[in-house]
Amino acid sequence: MRVDAFDFDLPPERIALRPAEPRESARLLRVRPGAAPELEDRTIADLPDLLQPGDALVVNDTKVIPARLDGTRTRAGGSTVAIEATLIRRLSGSAWAAFAKPAKRLAVGETVVFAGASGGTLEARVLDKLESGEVHFAFALSGPELDAAIDAIGHMPLPPYIAAKRPEDDRDRTDYQPVFARVEGSVAAPTASLHFTPDLLAKIAARGVSRYTVTLHVGAGTFLPVKAEDTTDHQMHAEWGEVSPETAAELNAVKARGGRIITVGSTATRLIETAATPEGSIRPYLGETDIFITPGYAFRASDVMLTNFHLPRSTLVMLVAAFVGHETQKRAYAHAIASGYRFYSYGDACLLER
């Protein structure tokens, strides 16, 4: 399909710069293709009532790391330049791949000293520069010591459409982190997860809905635009994920009992679909996935998806169109824009039913 088929105009004021407070007050658009009504305006607080006893809620327990680092490169003679690096992929115990700005001012072998706003520094040497724009850094620390240093001096990697309008602050340390985050490794939040609170999770459990975790580390590629004119020419970025044998067995048991698989976010959806067989059985999975889901894809495992409202021409809006049908997706997004829904990472959500 042509990528411009997934384009739409979004007024700038529809982009959320902060999450709803309280979280459960965020709006929720229920989308049921072929039902009457097809579109139903609710709130996140209504979610327990929209699920059924016996359903399984699948959440991504990845944890966002403060992956944006500010530093200085100094050359012999004293010339300096400010460097901003966003870590995107761990290469070893002491090395990371990153996007750096301005990368053209860095040379292999040079040292960058990253510093935190409240003190502390971290040195890194430029190992390599790739044509893709990646810069590989070897840090002076390794393992848990490196992790602690990054946590101390790093900034939360807010999406470009938020960072362009306001600076990151202390609130983002909690606002941009899901309540069930556990496994460090993401450089962007699985944003549908941001709507959950302990109280909401307790109400969902009381409804008779079980909860299972998978892990998919969200990479910076989630923000990269689709440059191809046709979806068949786009290469999806790869992200690391895991579905444990125990979780796979439990989800298969839920399906065997007639329960629905409710995937929270595009990350959990893509991982579960990667792990599923054509017959719908979910297998244990460990490794990278670059699954690219577009209209025409036959879903194997996910029955219902909770997700935010996404960017025009993005792979995420293509996933939504695949889930409920392209025409339904267009109607849902037009309704959301006209009705004042808030878009993107800190915005409102939709509950998609197939």
Swiss-Prot record:
Molecular-function GO term, any one: S-adenosylmethionine:tRNA ribosyltransferase-isomerase activity
The protein's enzyme class: transferase
GO cellular component: cytoplasm
Origin superkingdom: Bacteria
A Pfam cross-reference name: Queuosine_synth
SUPFAM superfamilies: QueA-like
GO biological process, one term: tRNA wobble guanine modification
Broad class of the protein's primary localization: cytoplasm
InterPro entries according to UniProt: QueA, QueA_dom1, QueA_dom2, QueA_sf
Keyword terms, alphabetized: Cytoplasm, Queuosine biosynthesis, S-adenosyl-L-methionine, Transferase
Transmembrane segments: none
Reactions it catalyzes: 7-aminomethyl-7-carbaguanosine(34) in tRNA + S-adenosyl-L-methionine = epoxyqueuosine(34) in tRNA + adenine + L-methionine + 2 H(+)
Pathway: tRNA modification; tRNA-queuosine biosynthesis
The enzyme's E.C. designation: 2.4.99.17
UniProt keyword Nucleus, yes or no: no
Subcellular location: Cytoplasm
Function: Transfers and isomerizes the ribose moiety from AdoMet to the 7-aminomethyl group of 7-deazaguanine (preQ1-tRNA) to give epoxyqueuosine (oQ-tRNA).
UniProt xrefs under PANTHER family: S-ADENOSYLMETHIONINE:TRNA RIBOSYLTRANSFERASE-ISOMERASE
Family: Belongs to the QueA family.
Subunit annotation: Monomer.
Matches recorded under HAMAP family: QueA
Name the record gives this protein: S-adenosylmethionine:tRNA ribosyltransferase-isomerase
Source species: Azorhizobium caulinodans (strain ATCC 43989 / DSM 5975 / JCM 20966 / LMG 6465 / NBRC 14845 / NCIMB 13405 / ORS 571)
Primary gene name: queA
